[in-house]
């Protein structure tokens, strides 16, 4: 049996290292965040006498952010902007129209983008303001409303930022401006460009994954990143969402595997087809997650079968060379997966055989040509 775990998880020469953002990219994001927060804090306070709070959300908050695979894909950073409102109508919605705040924020960001020589501002997203920093990096800024009395429980210090960011090197551990535990509120509303204010609480899913990563370990986080990178390679556009893949991985992940990331990934892939026969749930919200494209579910099942078969062959088949084994995995993850011509061995044949195998239905053709 081949030892391939380090080819996945090494931050220097492994696959995960290729997925990490570069220091240059982190610096671009870090510098932009400082400018955006200062700009919005000044404009919103001047206009409404409100001090907004900010929270890193999404993949940047989960620490599962990946380098894009294709030129058409982008690095996405989500920065939630939280605003307090004491004036609530009988409907329970802030009296200020959501589009008023969109207009204020859009205008401020457009002026900032010109000043900073960024690529501009996109207003096509109904649920956020999007700042285009470069051709492959953007920052999404959803606007939230929290009842005023509950908003006061969010701790404020150091110019509205709980944690200071000293350098781009500290990006991964100090980028959060507040801790989710400090958000003590019963209701949060998301501004929508066409539908006004909608109930939406990003805290639930963020805290759920923080807890799962803490309980189940860093291997789960890496597995989530491998699956997202696999998705990005197979679907240049569309495909299962990151939340879908992360919830699926968490559901299939029982505990860390001492035999390594290669074996754990194989286990997840082998279990996936049967698990996908029933709905995948967002446990934080107790709701079913659905594919935007109905064909994507079938493709995900077929891709997982093909990947698990090739990964099993790469690990177990001693008749092929180590280079060929790596090339088998590249068929599913792309050239970012490293090629090594001399790999160590490990004796885990019983472990491999104990993992249930799903077979590929070769009678049902794939409806979409696989990327790569």
Regions found by a protein language model. Name each.
Residues 138-214, 367-372:
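Extended, alpha-helix-rich binding/interface surfaces that flank or overlap catalytic cores
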Residues 209-320:
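Conserved nucleotidyltransferase catalytic core and NTase-mimicking acidic/glycine-rich helix/loop elements
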Residues 1-75, 81-100, 371:
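N-terminal regions immediately upstream of nucleotidyltransferase
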Residues 27, 40-44, 62, 95-162, ...:
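Conserved catalytic core of two-metal-ion nucleotidyltransferases
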Residues 1-16, 277-372:
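Terminal (often C-terminal) interaction modules
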Residues 57, 61, 130, 145, ...:
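Catalytic residues for metal-mediated phosphoryl-transfer on nucleic acids/nucleotides
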Residues 72-74, 247, 255-256, 260, ...:
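Acidic, low-complexity intrinsically disordered regions
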Residues 74-78, 126-128, 136-140, 168-170, ...:
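Extracellular structured ligand-interaction cores
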């Amino acid at each position: 049996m081949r030892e391939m775990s380090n080819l996945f998880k090494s931050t220097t020469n492994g696959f995960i290292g290729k997925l990490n953002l570069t220091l240059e990219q982190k610096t671009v994001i870090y510098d932009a965040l400082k400018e955006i927060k200062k700009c919005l804090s000044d404009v919103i306070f001047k206009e409404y006498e409100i001090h907004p709070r900010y929270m890193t959300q999404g993949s940047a908050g989960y620490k599962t952010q990946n380098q894009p695979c294709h030129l058409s894909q982008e690095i996405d950073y989500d920065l939630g902007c939280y605003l307090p409102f004491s004036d609530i109508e009988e409907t329970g919605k802030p009296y200020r129209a959501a589009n008023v705040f969109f207009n204020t924020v859009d205008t401020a960001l457009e002026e900032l983008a010109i000043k900073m020589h960024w690529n501009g501002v996109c207003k096509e997203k109904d649920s956020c303001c999007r700042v285009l920093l470069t051709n492959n990096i953007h920052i999404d800024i959803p606007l939230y409303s929290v009842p005023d009395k509950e908003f006061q429980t969010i701790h404020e210090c150091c110019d509205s930022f709980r944690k200071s960011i000293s350098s781009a090197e500290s990006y991964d551990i100090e980028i959060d401006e507040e801790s989710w535990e400090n958000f003590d509120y019963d209701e949060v509303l998301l501004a929508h460009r066409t539908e006004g204010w909608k109930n939406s609480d990003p805290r639930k899913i963020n805290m759920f994954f923080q807890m799962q990563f803490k309980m189940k370990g860093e291997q789960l986080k890496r597995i989530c990143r491998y699956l997202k990178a696999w998705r990005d390679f197979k679907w240049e556009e569309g495909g299962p969402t990151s939340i879908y893949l992360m919830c699926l991985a968490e559901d299939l992940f029982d505990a860390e595997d001492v035999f390594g990331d290669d074996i754990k990934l194989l286990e997840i892939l082998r279990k996936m087809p049967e698990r996908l026969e029933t709905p995948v749930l967002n446990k934080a919200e107790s709701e079913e997650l659905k594919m935007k494209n109905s064909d994507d579910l079938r493709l995900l099942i077929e891709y997982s079968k093909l990947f698990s078969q090739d990964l099993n062959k790469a690990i177990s088949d001693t008749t092929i060379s180590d280079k060929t084994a790596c090339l088998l995995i590249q068929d599913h993850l792309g050239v970012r997966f490293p090629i090594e011509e001399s790999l160590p061995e490990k004796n885990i044949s019983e472990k491999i055989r104990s993992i249930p195998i799903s077979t590929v239905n070769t009678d049902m053709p794939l409806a979409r040509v696989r990327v790569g």
